[in-house]
Structure formats: structure tokens, C-alpha cells
């Protein structure tokens, strides 16, 4: 239909024209913006359906960080959408993908200023906001552009903070002062905020010892309803744990903590601080994600026995260190959490030492373990040993994912053995496991 045609009500209506509203809304739900606009021209009833609130509650707005004719209208389209349907928004996700230069970051900043201003005036129901991976410490963000964007975001959060239940600013990469300014904006209308989910992983730039900042601890003290908290280990301190114990003991359920090799992580955190938090927040489970922090001495300072650890991920990518050994971590440290560990993820280069036996014993020791994923140098028979233990009821895995590194280009022999193992345990695998095993040349 020509977009210039008037909205008409045909005399001879088809069954489509008499569809119940609930069915029409379902049809519109699956249409893209362009098709929705065209469908709204069919008749008056369809035009009214176009403005149904439930069609516009969830929105992901993606901006390309590369100059392109194809993506030229993204910024204008985003503003048009917010002006037209922003009042219905409840969940908003904004993505700005790898900005190429300062021209595009400036365009994004100006668009965000208009978008957030319009949303702040028309919307009173926004519950979830996610703006991830801005990486504001990159050179493409000039100081003036970065400052203007932070100012717009802070002003918006001051106005909308009383409604927001979920906020994710993962990967913003701010200074401590900038980050705390944004966090304080959430509690501007009152001295506390109602957010239950907060994701500030990589919120601060690398190399910052946030744990020593009184500004950060004061900002976190305004949160009184946290259920899920995601952050970096360079934010963890006795003072933060004390604050969480006092203000969020009745609500806090999950903490996700990332520890990167480039983030300061040598601070002393007392086990008694973790013990108090675990005692008062009795349903708390903590998930750790380590990136290239692999040495036993460092891990032992962080993974204290008082922490109710649910999940541990240890990734070193492809880095190899012949002076490093994973064995003490597997035999002495991780079994400490045998009564709480449910998920284990490993990715490391252990070409210099065999760990099959230690890994197998760790799986058997952790009776609540249901998820096990590993990329490492292993014997193919390691998989068969795990499946045999599963068959005998010695472990209760529901997910088993293994990438077996080899030092050969050809993996024909390993592939043949893995096929034989699968045939032998096919009934067990099909009935109990999310199973993925592969041999992978590591050259």
C-alpha cells in the first residue's frame, strides 16, 4: 500500500479486519518497525493497535560505530522511536558498537542527549536500562564529548532513578569520580534507591584501586534493595562488604565478581567480613570470573573459605607459563568449596603438566557440581572416566563441555576414540547430559 494513502475502513472486510485485538497485537509483535508502520495504514483498527503499549515495552537500539550509508539513519530513527513510543518503554538496551572516530562519538553523544531528554519528559515506567561497553577511556572519546555524555546520563538517572529496578553500565570505563557521580545520581530524589540489579563490571577503568575509595563506598551505601550485584574485584573491600551486610542483607542473592590480571587485586579482605555478609545474607551465592589470574598464591588470597562460592571460572586464554602449576589450585584450594560449588569453567594451557587425575577427583569431591566446562590439554580417556563416574552415580553433571587440546594438526585418532566413547555411553548422554566434546589442535 502507498504510504500516502489515507487510513480507510473498507466496506467488504476480510477476516483480518475482524481479528480480535489480542490476535492483532500478537501479529504486530512479530513485525519489524517498517512493517508495523505499513500495517498501521490498513484500517483504523490496525492503526490503533500500532499504539498498544505492550508492543513497545522492550527495545534494543543499536548504533554502528563505523561510518556507513546503510547505518546513516540509525541516529534519527532512534530519536523518532523515543518521541513516538518512548512513553511505553519499560526495558531499554542501548548499544554503540566499536566507535571508529570522534565524529561518530560526537553524533552518538548528541543523539543520546536528545533521546534521554525526551524519555525523561514522557516516560514514568522505565524499569530496566542497559548501556554496555561504551569504553569511555578510549581516545575516540574526547574530554568534552565524554563529559557531555556523562552529564546527560546523570541528569536522566536523577529523574528516573526512583523507577529503575535494573541498571547495567558494564564496560563504561570511567574514573572513580565520574563513576561515583553517576551512581549517586540514582539516589538524587531520595537518599536511597530501589534498584535491585546493578551491573558495574568494568564500570571503572583498568588499573584503578577502587577498593580504597571512600567515594565509592558512600555511593554503594545508597543501595538498600540489591538482589544481584556484578562488579570487579578491585571494588571489593571490608568496608563494601560491611555496607552490603547492613543495607542489603535481606535481599542480596547473587554477587558476580570479575578479577582481571590488569585490575589491582592485591588488597587484604578479611574472611570475617565475608563470613558476616554470608551469615546475614543467608541466601547469597558468589560467582567468580578470573581472567589470567591463575597463580595459586593470588587465588588463595581472594578465594577465602568463608565465601559461599557457587561458580568459578578460570581462564588464561592461550598464555603459557612453564613456572606456573595448576595442580595446587585443583587439589588444595578448590576442594575447600566442595559443599557449595555448582559450576566450574576452566580454560588454560597446561601443556607442561598432566591434570587429568586432579580434575577427575575434583569433580567427584564437589557433590553439587552440575556444570563442568574445560579447554585444556587432556587425555581423551578423561572424558570416558567422567562418563563412567556419572553412570555409577558418583557425580551428577547435567552439562559436560570439553575441548581437548593436542599438539598435532591431525586429530583423527582422538576423533575416532571420542566417537567410540559416545557410542558406548550414548544412552546416558542423551538422557542426562548437555554434552559437547571435541579434539582441537593447539599449535
From Swiss-Prot:
Biological process terms in GO annotation: SCF-dependent proteasomal ubiquitin-dependent protein catabolic process
Gene: Fbxo39
Protein name: F-box only protein 39
SUPFAM superfamilies in UniProt: F-box domain (SSF81383), RNI-like (SSF52047)
Keywords, ordered alphabetically: Ubl conjugation pathway
GO cellular component: SCF ubiquitin ligase complex
Species, as recorded: Rattus norvegicus
Domain of life the protein comes from: Eukaryota
Function (record text): Substrate-recognition component of the SCF (SKP1-CUL1-F-box protein)-type E3 ubiquitin ligase complex.
Record-annotated F-box domain positions: 13-59
Lineage: Eukaryota, Metazoa, Chordata, Craniata, Vertebrata
Complexes and interactors: Directly interacts with SKP1 and CUL1.
Alphabetical list of CDD domains matching this protein: F-box_FBXO39
Pfam families linked to this entry: F-box-like (PF12937)
